From Swiss-Prot:
Origin species: Mycobacterium tuberculosis (strain CDC 1551 / Oshkosh)
InterPro entries assigned to the protein according to its UniProt record, in alphabetical order: EryCIII-like_C, Glycosyltransferase_28, GlycoTrans_28_N, UDP_glucos_trans
Residues spanning the membrane: none
Entry's Gene Ontology molecular function annotations: hexosyltransferase activity; UDP-glycosyltransferase activity
Protein name: Uncharacterized glycosyltransferase MT1575
């Protein structure tokens, strides 16, 4: 069978789709990933076929959005409109690039960003659609915003957000549908996807949101987080450094723009020195040139979370779904310093599970970091983290279950 996977975003958005694509390809299927041009090399190096999905570098796009908006005090309506501008501007281009690629596919799989674009292309071709969700995006009563609210209010809030997003993108979506020969949409995409019977795979563990599986009643299968568990060039060097002394605390912020890396390294170094801890810092896309050097701190660009996390005392990160799952699977406490998107939701869930704490990244200081680390390194957090790890879905099982679901959905539509 032919599977086309459309995924927009940065590395953390693409890797789950690539992990599933590799398993489908291993089973003998024809798989093609449509990804931002800056991530084509990442996908091809993994062994998959890739085509451009959009013309912009998605990391540069993220950096520009943060540089323009993140630290400003603005009218919230103006801020919302500015945040939506990159979404609406890229809509037509993504549709035009994906439509010919998806022709003849047995199933079209979308990542979490631009699902509406992909849903319309699938409807145009008359092929089944499946979606990967990295946190609960459909109406439910279990997530926090970031405070925990009554379940009916949470459900109505999510429904209202869906409606508002639809209204703000209706112009570009109607134009896309007209170009594809489809009528104007009269309801938000989540409702249309449900009517079409689209498969919505929850690529996280149900235990992370107690009560959610019961609320949804099996309509949206949970498979656990999807990862390729790829090795990196730094893994052996990092393993030797870790083995030479006490286990470190890991610090990494994914693709998030975090301002001056030198300032962050200095703050982390000072906090860990006071606690008598070592720090392993992943710089990610940040420029590590000229950062200060400390005996108890090691800075690398990227490491394998699967290989390194189990050898650390705790993890401190931005709260991306994949990094959060890696920390939970490793069985060590977590501190989430969140920046945007679903990250405060994961911070709230880490707190609810009693395996860590969270706060806004911009509010973190040396003093708050010391206090938070002291809290999560306490024996009760360590014990609870190990207990949760024993209940997490194994990465291989997550990928297998997802591929099974996609094959079944494609076969049923034939």
């Amino acid at each position: 069978m032919k599977f086309v996977v459309a995924s927009y975003g940065t590395r953390g958005d693409i890797e789950p789709c690539a992990a599933v694509g590799l398993e489908l390809q291993r089973r003998g299927h024809d798989v093609c990933l449509a990804v931002p041009p800056n991530l084509i090399g990442f996908v091809e190096t993994a062994g998959l076929s890739a085509v451009a999905y959009g013309s912009r570098d998605s990391q540069e796009q993220l950096d520009e959005q943060f540089l323009h908006n993140a630290w400003k005090l603005q009218n919230p309506i103006k801020l919302l409109r500015e945040a939506m501008a990159p979404v609406t501007e890229g809509w037509a281009e993504l549709s035009a690039m994906l439509t010919p690629v998806a022709a003849g596919a047995d199933l079209l799989l979308t990542g979490q960003i631009y699902q509406e674009v992909v849903a319309n292309v699938a409807e145009h071709h008359g092929i089944p659609l499946a979606a990967l969700h990295f946190y609960p995006v459909r109406a439910n009563g279990e997530i926090a915003f970031p405070a925990r609210l009554p379940a009916p209010l949470v459900r109505s809030t999510i429904t209202a957000i869906d409606w508002l997003y639809w209204r703000m993108t209706k112009g570009v979506e109607d134009a896309q549908r007209r170009e594809l020969g489809l009528p104007k949409a009269s309801t938000p995409a989540p409702r249309r996807m449900a009517v079409r019977g689209s498969l919505e795979i929850q690529a996280y563990d149900a235990l992370c949101f107690p009560g959610l599986a019961a609320e949804w009643g099996g309509r949206r299968p949970f498979v656990g987080a999807l990862t390729m568990e790829s090795a990196t060039d730094a893994d052996d060097e990092v393993a030797s450094w870790i083995a030479a002394d006490t286990p470190p605390i890991y610090f990494g912020f994914g693709s998030m723009p975090i301002g001056s890396l030198a300032d962050r390294v200095a703050m982390i170094s000072a906090a860990c020195a006071e606690l008598g801890e070592r720090a392993l810092i992943c710089s990610g896309p940040s420029d590590a040139t000229g950062i200060p050097q400390f005996d108890h701190v090691k800075v690398v660009r990227v490491v394998s979370h699967a290989a390194v996390f189990p050898t650390c005392r705790a993890v401190v990160h931005h709260g991306g779904a994949g990094t959060t799952a890696a920390g939970l699977r490793a069985g060590i406490p977590t501190l989430i310093l969140w920046v945007t998107s679903d990250q405060p939701i994961w911070a709230a869930q880490i707190k609810q599970l009693k395996v860590g704490r969270g706060r806004r990244f911009s509010s973190a200081t040396k003093e708050s970091l010391i206090a938070d680390l002291r809290t999560i390194l306490a024996p009760d957090y360590v014990t609870r983290a190990r207990e949760i790890a024993s209940r997490m879905t194994k990465p291989a099982a997550s990928v297998t279950a997802t591929a099974d679901l996609l094959e079944d959905a494609a076969r049923r539509a034939r």
